[in-house]
């Protein structure tokens, strides 16, 4: 838990420091805070059900059509119960994920964009960490409202933990 808090604090410091220097020279940086819903896919769906969470993201505009992003979040997926017949039910534990990702956004139009991110996910209960990638498509519904749909996968030696995610965010 201390590593997670330290990682989020470092990211927030870097984004804030970058934002302060960027605004003074006229370039744009945006922040967003969002709520996320995740639907497990692949092997992950056999042990987990729907997940909920939140995320923070900073975006530095390198041009009118492209941006560099840095994000951190928290998602919690509840564990499923599976009936083993005569042995009774087995309840899988919940899975909590803290993704820390860097990426690039390409705007196809004023409202529609593609977003690719890579980084690390940290898991609860001594689950360690894993390389993570997350391609997404999104739409700016208004100047401050952002919706995106993503596929996020964390690859570990024991397999892949993946989900389809929907993010609704307020941009400021």
Where are the model-predicted features located?
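Residues on the lipid-exposed face of transmembrane beta-strands in outer-membrane beta-barrel proteins
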Residues: 35-39, 54-60, 74, 100-106, ...
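Mid-chain, well-packed structural core segment of small domains
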Residues: 107-127
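Short glycine/proline- and aromatic-enriched beta-strand/turn motifs that initiate or cap beta-hairpins
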Residues: 20-65, 111, 161-172
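Cleavable N-terminal export/targeting peptides
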Residues: 1-28
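Predominantly the C-terminal beta-signal and adjacent terminal strand-loop region
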Residues: 24-26, 42, 74, 80-81, ...
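Detector for outer-membrane/organellar transmembrane beta-barrel domains
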Residues: 34, 59-79, 89, 95-103, ...
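Flexible, solvent-exposed loop segments that connect beta-strands
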Residues: 39-47, 76-96, 124-128, 157-159
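Repeated loop/turn-to-beta-strand initiation elements of outer-membrane beta-barrel proteins
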Residues: 65-68, 111-114, 141-149
